[in-house]
């Protein structure tokens, strides 16, 4: 039974949800994913979390130890390989830096707003882990800004309105 490490940055931060989905998974520690930002993509309404490279940004994560049965359950939940792909990302933990498996959204899907229940699940995970929810709230705001820019690019608006979040 080969175990591996997996990082959660979205709804899988919620330990109650993970206990139901992956009963043998265990939290190892928290960490930081430097050089990435949290965003919401997939649809304008009901978007889901992903991380994308961005110099200077960082995303708090939980590092989980998972077994093959947990990984199969995560594959189903994450829509692997169609919605998410598996990627090894460099995570900084107290014990140092290490490449850890993460699910990262495939393709260029549209930006959007997460469903309230999905957002609340992530917020609960942030609170339980002691993470600053400012990162989560900034991710929602940035995703909304990008969604609106996709619908009506700022240069086409000629300054006729200004969005403030």
Question: How should each PLM-predicted stretch be described?
Answer:
Residues 1-165:
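Glycine-aromatic micro-motifs
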């Amino acid at each position: 039974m080969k175990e591996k490490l997996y990082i959660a940055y979205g709804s899988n931060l919620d330990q109650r949800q993970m206990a139901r989905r992956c009963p043998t998974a265990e939290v190892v520690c928290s960490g930081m994913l430097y050089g990435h930002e949290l965003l919401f993509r997939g649809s304008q309404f009901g978007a889901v979390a992903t991380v994308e490279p961005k110099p200077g940004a960082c995303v708090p994560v939980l590092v989980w130890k998972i077994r093959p049965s947990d990984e199969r359950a995560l594959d189903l939940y994450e829509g692997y390989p169609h919605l998410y792909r598996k990627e090894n990302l460099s995570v900084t933990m107290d014990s140092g830096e290490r490449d850890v498996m993460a699910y990262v959204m495939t393709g260029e899907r549209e930006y959007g707003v997460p469903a309230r229940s999905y957002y609340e699940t992530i917020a609960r995970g942030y609170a339980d882990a002691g993470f600053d929810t400012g990162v989560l709230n900034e991710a929602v705001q940035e995703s909304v800004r990008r969604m609106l820019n996709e619908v009506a690019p700022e240069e086409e608006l000629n300054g006729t309105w200004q969005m403030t979040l």
